[in-house]
Amino acid sequence: MPGQITAFDIGECMVKAACFTGGKLKKVMAKELPDNMVSGGEIVSMDAMADFIKEMAKENGISRGAAAVILPGTLVFTRNVTVPAMTDGQLLYNLPFEFKDYLTQEKNKYYFDYAVQDTVKDEEGNVKELQLFVCATLKSTVEEYRAMLRRAGFNLKVAMPEECAYAALTEDLSLIHI
């Protein structure tokens, strides 16, 4: 079905999934993991996790297709930074330098992304600085998750750090008037 995506949060002892169609939540589920499937936030066996997710999807009648996954904090570098105003292209070029003290491999082995949290303007209203949430993760990490989800019958479309998932959730909740 168009506009359908299933989001997975793979924790230490449970996998949680939420199915969305057209941006609306349709179904949520959670299933306890067998012992030793995840250790220190990292999946021990991608093949075993793929089989677990495939079975979970089957048990809950989840249509296979587009998927999103929350990457554990142990696999993603994140920072809040302030930079001078610049274009998207300039930002993407400069992001690796924000992580120079943290990266353990060549910068071409990482995906980098950012979200603008706020802008600082001068007296004339021109953007002077950007306050950003920036992140980096190894390309091999994303490819491991892509292969795992493919084995389970899903097509990875979004991989995000847990901080972004929580930020998106709180942003959505702020739109609800209680």
How would you name each of these model-derived features?
Residues 1-102, 143, 173-174:
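Non-catalytic, solvent-exposed interaction/assembly segments
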Residues 71-172:
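Active-site neighborhood for divalent-cation/phosphate handling
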